[in-house]
Amino acid sequence: MTAQVLDGKATAAAIREELKERVAALRARGVVPGLGTILVGDDPGSHAYVRGKHRDCAEVGIASIRKDLPADATQADVEAAVAELNADPACTGFIVQLPLPRGLDENRVLEKIDPAKDADGLHPSNLGKLVLMEEAPLPCTPRGIVELLNRYGVSLRGAEVVVVGRGVTVGRPLGLLLTRRSENATVTLCHTGTRDLAAHTRRADIVVAAAGVPGLITKDMVSPGAVVLDVGVTRTEKGLVGDVAPDVAEVAGYLSPNPGGVGPMTRAMLLTNVVEAAERSLS
């Protein structure tokens, strides 16, 4: 068996085409969605991510607002940039590119974001609304995972899903998304401290690997025909490495690779959050 690839690049491209039409409709009504970014420091990876986000904006017609701060920016400098974007009517939503340089309090910065402009869906208020199943911007990577599965016709209703990773950006909120009535999956949240991880993953219909441990999920840990999504990212001397070993493709029914799987979907959902915020402003 060779797994069918869940192609995040192609799916994200299709979503951007759909967003072009929605943005054109907004512009026709005098509303220009704007995405802001706050980037602190000189990390090449962070700069590449931000450039990619603004390329996406240009493609679909979303205005770009960049605030680049030096590596020695203080906590007050970063919070001032957040306050400026909170107050800027041209900014529909914005993100603070993480990680921030050492010495800066990321949580405090994120808490300063206006929840209505939280394009990443990671403000504590919005995560709380997700728990309460109230409408709010959704975390981009978990939303991208669900959207990718839906677009390939992978049924979530009643599915046994094992999520490996307990981070705030993926693991924890993904479980909340998957257990909504609209998805109705049954979720087991595992992590690097889980005893006999393979026993959990082998019984899963869907495995989402988001622990940040290279090669954590191997083919003997996956049931034949299961759906596997590789979301973990670790920087090594050889480049970015995911959590799923290459041999998993021999047994899985579907595989979302890394790179090229969930990453492009995360960026597409960022744009979607901004467009939806602009649409809400008209209602």
UniProtKB/Swiss-Prot annotation:
SUPFAM superfamilies: Aminoacid dehydrogenase-like, N-terminal domain (SSF53223), NAD(P)-binding Rossmann-fold domains (SSF51735)
One MF annotation (Gene Ontology) recorded for this entry: methylenetetrahydrofolate dehydrogenase (NADP+) activity
Keyword list, A-Z: Amino-acid biosynthesis, Histidine biosynthesis, Hydrolase, Methionine biosynthesis, Multifunctional enzyme, NADP, One-carbon metabolism, Oxidoreductase, Purine biosynthesis
Catalysed reaction, written as an equation: (6R)-5,10-methylene-5,6,7,8-tetrahydrofolate + NADP(+) = (6R)-5,10-methenyltetrahydrofolate + NADPH; (6R)-5,10-methenyltetrahydrofolate + H2O = (6R)-10-formyltetrahydrofolate + H(+)
Gene Ontology terms describing biological process: L-histidine biosynthetic process; methionine biosynthetic process; purine nucleotide biosynthetic process; tetrahydrofolate interconversion
InterPro entries, per the entry: Aminoacid_DH-like_N_sf, NAD(P)-bd_dom_sf, THF_DH/CycHdrlase, THF_DH/CycHdrlase_cat_dom, THF_DH/CycHdrlase_NAD-bd_dom
Residues binding NADP(+): 165-167, 192, 233
Pathway stated in the Swiss-Prot or TrEMBL entry: One-carbon metabolism; tetrahydrofolate interconversion
Top-rank taxon: Bacteria
Pfam family, one: THF_DHG_CYH
GO cellular-component term (any): cytosol
EC number: 1.5.1.5, 3.5.4.9
Homology family: Belongs to the tetrahydrofolate dehydrogenase/cyclohydrolase family.
Role, per record: Catalyzes the oxidation of 5,10-methylenetetrahydrofolate to 5,10-methenyltetrahydrofolate and then the hydrolysis of 5,10-methenyltetrahydrofolate to 10-formyltetrahydrofolate.
Subunit record text: Homodimer.
Record-given protein name: Bifunctional protein FolD
Species assigned in the record: Thermobifida fusca (strain YX)
Taxonomy of the source species: Bacteria, Bacillati, Actinomycetota, Actinomycetes, Streptosporangiales
Gene name of the record: folD
